[in-house]
Amino acid sequence: MILTPLVAIYWLWAVWAITWTLAGAWAARPAKRMPRREERPHLIVTFTGIALLFFFRGGPVLWTPSAGAGWALAGLATLSFAFCWWARLTMGRLWAPLVSRTAEHRLVATGPFAVVRHPIYAGLCGAVIAVALAQGLATSLVGAALAIVGFTMKGALEERFLRQELGAEAYDAYARRTPMLIPFWPR
């Protein structure tokens, strides 16, 4: 098999998904969780986007990136996943796959959380953009857009939950000085 930029991006996604899932065993048990019905909308939007990116490869090819552009997109995916992992390691056992709070939960505002409030979602946005641009398909662009909307929805849900659980004053001060997903974006 020849390693093309797109194949490299698929491998990066596979390695990230496997290691991310395995690392879930490291997370602390939640003391309180958001009701699942409140999470359902962002899950539907996000997983529809991911399905369009990886499982529905039909539709017109809008472009085929050059080898250099393809490898630059593979680099973007690599950096994006590294940003996700930096955030996950910074959170430690506070991380959870669903919107929840652990008994020892606190506001994390260091490392990548000093750059954006949701560095995992920011990294995933970069990774879905990389795969969509490398595929060059209309369905991929729609999938990436839906996934990004889903990540943004989950970020907003987490913020509402954390304001309630950790106190609005501290979280609002953090939100005033740190953009949600895009580094250096005006607040």
Identify the residue ranges that each predicted region occupies.
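Histidine-centered phosphotransfer motif of kinases
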Residues: 110, 114-122
